[in-house]
């Protein structure tokens, strides 16, 4: 990715910022999804998949940066420590570059259109998240599908499309569910930090569940998340016990399990050798 930025970005100051952004990235799970789907469907062009994988990681990084700038959190990130105008321009360059690189992997018009469709779907999901649009479990799941599901579907679907030249609806279906699972995991981890969606009263699955106030612990937790001085005094074990008493943890686990079962059911319909299906599942579910 750093080599691509060096080659494509002529403005040295802008390049320096982008290189710093990339250096902060320590995982490449979306590139792995693209690569393993490409290989599972017998892709052979090493250069093409390398371009797609690099472009995908640049795209994911740009969306992560946009998310931080919009939510004004993750203060320790390098892009949050510089002038917001510089950060915004730099991330726009990163996003544009990512699209350009991915589209170079294949010259088929439909390939580029699918990439843009996934990106636009995620942006629309992000808008619903920013304005706190979801008011029910169903609308929240739809928002998650658009925001997170589309970004997870992109590497899986495009990896297969690069290998076969065709859009694969089954791959799209289970990869959206994978995105929902990942977001549920993120929401769960966020329950244990003060600067989380609860403080902003974001209508996440967990917050919507608590708002139903099924028991006294739910009411207590809703109040607790609005009192920073009390929240920081509670240890993780006690907080986890309260979340369990309120039923939040069980609820999120059930939702995650439902997505996992859908993934396994869809993957069983793939016309792949068993070892390839198992390999894909092991890459997706860790």
Model segments located where?
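Catalytic cores of Mg2+-dependent Asp-rich isoprenoid enzymes
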Residues: 14, 18-39, 204-209, 237-241, ...
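N-terminal amphipathic/basic leader segments beginning at the initiator methionine
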Residues: 1-4
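A short structural micro-motif
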Residues: 121, 181, 227-231, 262, ...
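Intrinsically disordered, low-complexity segments enriched in Gly and acidic/Ser/Thr residues
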Residues: 219-221, 231-234
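Mg2+-dependent prenyl diphosphate-binding active-site environment of isoprenoid biosynthetic enzymes
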Residues: 7-219
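Residue-level signal for secondary-structure boundary elements
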Residues: 123, 127-130, 183, 233, ...
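Gly/Pro-rich interdomain helix-loop hinge
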Residues: 216-226, 241-242, 251
């Amino acid at each position: 990715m750093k080599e691509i930025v060096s080659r494509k970005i002529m403005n040295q100051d802008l390049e320096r910022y982008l290189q710093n952004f990339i250096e902060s990235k320590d995982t490449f799970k979306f590139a792995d999804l693209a690569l393993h789907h490409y290989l599972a469907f017998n892709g052979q062009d090493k250069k093409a998949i390398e371009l797609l994988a690099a472009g995908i990681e640049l795209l994911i990084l740009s969306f992560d940066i946009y998310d931080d700038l919009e939510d004004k959190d993750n203060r320790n990130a390098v892009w949050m420590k510089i002038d917001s105008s510089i950060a915004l321009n730099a991330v726009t360059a990163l996003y544009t570059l990512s699209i350009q690189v991915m589209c170079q992997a294949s010259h088929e018009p439909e390939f580029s259109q699918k990439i843009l469709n996934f990106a636009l779907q995620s942006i629309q999901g992000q808008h619903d998240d920013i304005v706190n649009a979801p008011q029910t479990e169903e609308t929240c799941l739809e928002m998650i599908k658009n925001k997170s599901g589309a970004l997870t579907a992109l590497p899986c679907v495009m990896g297969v499309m690069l290998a076969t030249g065709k859009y694969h609806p089954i791959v799209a279906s289970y990869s959206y569910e994978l995105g929902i699972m990942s977001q549920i995991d993120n929401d769960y981890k966020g329950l244990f930090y003060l600067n989380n969606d609860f403080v902003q009263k974001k209508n996440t699955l967990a917050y919507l569940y608590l708002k139903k106030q099924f028991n006294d612990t739910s009411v207590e937790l809703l109040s607790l998340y609005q009192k920073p001085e009390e929240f920081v005094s509670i240890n993780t074990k006690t907080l986890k016990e309260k979340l369990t008493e309120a039923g939040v943890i069980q609820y999120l686990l059930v939702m995650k399990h439902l997505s996992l079962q859908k993934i396994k059911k869809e993957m069983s319909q793939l016309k792949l050798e068993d070892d390839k299906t198992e390999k894909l599942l092991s890459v997706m579910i860790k």
